[in-house]
Amino acid sequence: MVTANSTVKVGNVTFSNSAPLALIAGPCQMETRDHAFEMAGHLKEMTDKLGIGLVYKSSFDKANRTSLKAARGIGLEKALEVFSDLKKEYGFPVLTDIHTEEQCAAVAPVVDVLQIPAFLCRQTDLLIAAARTGRVVNVKKGQFLAPWDMKNVLAKITESGNPNVLATERGVSFGYNTLVSDMRALPIMAGLGAPVIFDATHSVQQPGGQGGSTGGQREFVETLARAAVAVGVAGLFIETHEDPDNAPSDGPNMVPIDKMPALLEKLMAFDRIAKAL
């Protein structure tokens, strides 16, 4: 029986619940090539300066938008070209979400981490297909799922022969259009063996809260991120944008890119204290 690795390496970035904090960050969706390079350049510069490992993230297709008319991204083929060029230019690993088994084989030659969206975390065939690529798999815990039930989700990946899996907490449904973060979930999920990531931006979502789109409360991103880092996590997942209020998706919960350096500096200080105790 294969069990989850407690330390997962993605390129030059190490994820472990006892190692220094790592970061998964980028804009919600890949809008254009130029925008991807702009965001990547800012993130690379700040993380190099702060000494934090970076996995760059962006989605080629936002397949679960609230409205049929909402922008979804630039598509798989174009995104893979951009991801490949970003890796060559900046040297960091990259992450994107996949939604079907067929996408796994197409994405894996380029992308370092295949992410399973929260709504799809119980889809057995998708989990198996992602695991069999041999790439690191990051599973978002469903908003409907208890943290201890992630045991079965992780087992679908590890028992398919892939021990390199990350488990991400991104809030739990609390009535209509609202998520809350139960910090007990972090040590519970850590007890399952895999490195745990806290998604600080999707945790402040208000799903469908704007009628035709998702709302959010970005003013609470730092609050929740501080709490998670104080508890102890392997990494943080933070979506960022230069103009969140005009972003095509998830703007209300994304962090302005110019606010990221100060935020990360604070969070790294909390991380050092938490892991020294």
UniProtKB/Swiss-Prot annotation:
User: InterPro entries under this entry?
Assistant: Aldolase_TIM, DAHP1/KDSA, KDO8P_synthase
Q: In which pathway does it act?
A: Carbohydrate biosynthesis; 3-deoxy-D-manno-octulosonate biosynthesis; 3-deoxy-D-manno-octulosonate from D-ribulose 5-phosphate: step 2/3; Bacterial outer membrane biogenesis; lipopolysaccharide biosynthesis
Which top-level group of life is the source organism from?
Bacteria
Protein name, per record: 2-dehydro-3-deoxyphosphooctonate aldolase
The record's listing under Pfam families reads: DAHP_synth_1 (PF00793)
In terms of NCBIfam families, this protein maps to: KDO8P_synth, PRK05198.1
Where does it live in the cell? Cytoplasm
One GO cellular component term of this record is: cytoplasm
Show the SUPFAM superfamilies listed in the entry: Aldolase
Single Gene Ontology BP annotation: keto-3-deoxy-D-manno-octulosonic acid biosynthetic process
Q: Which reaction does it catalyse?
A: D-arabinose 5-phosphate + phosphoenolpyruvate + H2O = 3-deoxy-alpha-D-manno-2-octulosonate-8-phosphate + phosphate
The UniProt record lists the EC number as 2.5.1.55
Task: Tell me the keywords, alphabetical order.
Answer: Cytoplasm, Lipopolysaccharide biosynthesis, Transferase
